[in-house]
């Protein structure tokens, strides 16, 4: 799992579930505690002026007051309790549904009534776009809702360059028919100047290790969502000839967030699992604690050395 992207994408996925609940006539809420700069354009699409209830988005504290034994809790884009916005919410009801495209680990949501996990899907957005098409209630998405789902696919696939299959394009085509507009989505995903400069700095100061691995640090000061910028920098580094995998470290809130990316030859998921993280073949991440940035870089280099010697990567 690439943990630094979860906060940026989570709100996108939750809004898809809300769309289904709305058509079914069921009251629904999105649990979100912090609205970052990356989420703000998405949240602004779902205001009271646009026909959405004022209490569409609620905090974890409010959710814990509202939940009862009849509440259905839907977990999207993760199957690990600690990666959810409010892990305690999962203990308050027995009706839990999980939608995810990440491989399961030992730490999973326990006893869901439905667990739809498809590791071969490009994104949870792709999965839910498919499900929405087969509702007997004939769900009609609003253009702004289709925009958000389309944006989620773009983010997870790095503009259709990673983990993209036939189903991905079919989901995108469905969303375009629902009114998703590429220009609006592009504006939604733009960075501010400070974030753009930080990403450029991370790419500029990258070091090449053993001739094929790019390792860099993303500065976190003056940026509202530094971990997302670090993930973007990791994607950028793959555009350099000869780089098989990239690793960008972002020190933030007492942790070192590691974003790792590859194109096809290196399984970064295996590398990140050695560091306590996980993800996919080409997109993965980890969170390191109790170490400095230099110590984290050394851990990555040592892990690469070990795996090269053992033949786990080439």
What positions do the PLM features span?
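Hydrophobic helix-and-loop "lid/oligomerization" segment in the mid-to-C-terminal part
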Residues: 1, 7-47, 64-72, 150, ...
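Glycine-rich, phosphate-binding/catalytic loops in enzymes
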Residues: 17, 90-93, 114-115, 171
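Active-site cofactor/cluster-binding pocket
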Residues: 52, 56-111
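A generic local secondary-structure boundary/capping motif
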Residues: 61-64, 84-88, 115-119, 138-140, ...
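Conserved beta-strand scaffold positions in the cores of enzyme catalytic domains, especially
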Residues: 96-98, 113-116, 213-215, 248
């Amino acid at each position: 799992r690439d943990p630094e992207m979860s906060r940026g994408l989570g709100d996108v996925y939750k809004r898809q579930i809300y769309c289904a609940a709305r058509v079914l006539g069921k009251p629904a809420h999105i649990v979100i505690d912090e609205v970052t700069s990356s989420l703000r354009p998405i949240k602004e699409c779902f205001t009271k002026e646009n026909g959405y209830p004022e209490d569409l988005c609620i905090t974890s504290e409010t959710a814990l007051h509202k939940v009862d034994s009849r509440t259905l809790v839907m977990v999207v884009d993760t199957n690990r309790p600690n990666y959810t916005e409010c892990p305690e919410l999962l203990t308050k009801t027995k009706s839990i549904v999980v939608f995810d495209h990440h491989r399961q680990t030992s730490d999973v949501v326990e006893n869901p009534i439905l667990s739809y996990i498809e590791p071969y899907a490009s994104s949870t957005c792709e999965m839910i776009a498919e499900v929405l098409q087969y509702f007997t209630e004939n769900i009609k998405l609003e253009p702004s809702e289709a925009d958000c789902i389309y944006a989620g696919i773009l983010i997870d696939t790095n503009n259709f360059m990673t983990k993209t299959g036939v189903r991905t394009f079919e989901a995108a085509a469905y969303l375009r028919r629902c009114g998703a507009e590429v220009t609006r989505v592009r504006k939604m995903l733009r960075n501010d100047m400070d974030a753009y400069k930080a990403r450029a700095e991370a790419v500029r100061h990258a070091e090449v290790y053993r001739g094929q691995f790019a390792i860099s640090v993303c500065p976190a000061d003056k940026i509202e969502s530094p971990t997302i910028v670090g993930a973007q920098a990791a994607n950028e580094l793959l555009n350099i000839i000869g780089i098989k995998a990239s690793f960008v470290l972002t020190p933030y809130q007492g942790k070192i967030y590691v974003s790792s990316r590859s194109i096809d030859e290196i399984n970064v998921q295996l590398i990140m699992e050695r560091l306590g993280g996980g993800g996919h073949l080409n997109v993965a991440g980890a969170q390191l604690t109790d170490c400095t940035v230099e110590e984290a870089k050394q851990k990555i280099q040592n892990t690469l050395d070990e795996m090269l010697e053992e033949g786990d990567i080439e």
